[in-house]
């Protein structure tokens, strides 16, 4: 499931599995209907957390993508400076080697 992806954090591939498609649909629902209820942008990261979650579940699948997204959300707060934080192409669970 850890296919090579573009380095562009906004280049989001289409999820392949049904659980990943379901998770991606939940994120898109949040983006379309709930995110706009907040006043202005509140995310201190680039890409924003919902885009990160969408790419994480699309690239790594529902389970691993949810873990990555939860880890990202746990950084949300004044104790973390934020900044550029893209979805990793490979993680600790990957059996692929980076050359």
From Swiss-Prot:
Write down the membrane topology: Peripheral membrane protein
Q: What cellular-component terms does GO give this entry?
A: plasma membrane
Q: InterPro entries recorded for this chain?
A: Membr_insert_effic_factor_YidD (IPR002696)
UniProt keyword list: Cell membrane, Membrane
Is Cell membrane a UniProt keyword of this protein? yes
Top-rank lineage group of the source organism: Bacteria
Q: Does the keyword Membrane apply?
A: yes
Intracellular or extracellular location(s):
Cell membrane
The primary site where this protein sits is membrane
Q: Which PANTHER family match?
A: MEMBRANE PROTEIN INSERTION EFFICIENCY FACTOR-RELATED (PTHR33383:SF1)
What family name appears in the similarity comment?
Belongs to the UPF0161 family.
Function of the molecule: Could be involved in insertion of integral membrane proteins into the membrane.
- Protein name as annotated: Putative membrane protein insertion efficiency factor
